[in-house]
Amino acid sequence: MKTENVRKGVFYLLVTSFLFSSQQALGKVLYYLSTFERTFYFSLVAAIIMGLLCKWKKQPLIAGNLKLIGMRSLFGYLSTVLLFLAATQTYLVANISLLSSTSTIFALLAAVIWLKEHMARGQVLSVFIAFAGILLILRPTGGFIEAESLAGLGAGFFAGLAYTVVRKLKDESPFTITFCFMSFSVIASLPFVLMQGFSPLGLKEIAVLILTGAVCAAAQYFLSVAYSYAPSTKISVYLYAQNLFAFLIGIVFFHELPDWIAIAGGCLLIGAGILNFISGREAQRRLSHDI
């Protein structure tokens, strides 16, 4: 067991945030490939890497609770598919990142409904602030919302459900969970790819797909390293840095600049996430003190 080191935990979580935003950007690079092809290839690479990591860490390849691991894998797979659907040529990387960040709010709501957890007042307020931010990003006009926006929001929703299931899998290795999730994604995507037919891949496509899978595996690895140095209650808020990285990546590599309405919505979403983090931590402290 490592000695607690918050600074190292924060550092590795910032590395993870950069990798997550890079993964989203790489998904956009190959926008012309079908969603299921991107999911299949990237998951295949990530599954191979995570399988090797499991062997290196002497962790099992199959989780003990197959029902929960199946739920986590299904929700994670749906989130990935929707994330790639949102990653079109014209949709902003920053918006994809922000909408996927709604996972923390949806995880909070899922924990209340499924795990029967109690929400602190600040967390209730954070939900309303988050949905105000979501409305600014979605910006429905005349009852119409962009398909990419709905896909990004759906990705956040299913990711939130997946993270809630992971909390029930606390006795399982994170490497095993991720290997099962990636393997499930490969198997689930294959029938769709076979029906659509495989697209011819050049060196660029092969390189980007391998890099995407490697970045995903690295993100999962560094996430585990970060939480081995410090508990999530102390450092998880730094995951919101991925939105800043996505914003910068969008400007530098895609020449994208969100308008002030989307930026305002993003600020509300990030603010809601930070409020949720602080309120949840304070509620935990009070509960521990009462006990």
Kindly label every feature range from the protein language model.
Residues 57-58, 103-125, 244-263:
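C-terminal transmembrane-helix exit sites in multi-pass transporters
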Residues 96-102, 169-184, 220-252:
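Helix-helix packing/entry segments at the starts of transmembrane helices
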Residues 122-138, 155, 261-280:
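Hydrophobic transmembrane alpha-helices of multi-pass small-molecule transport proteins
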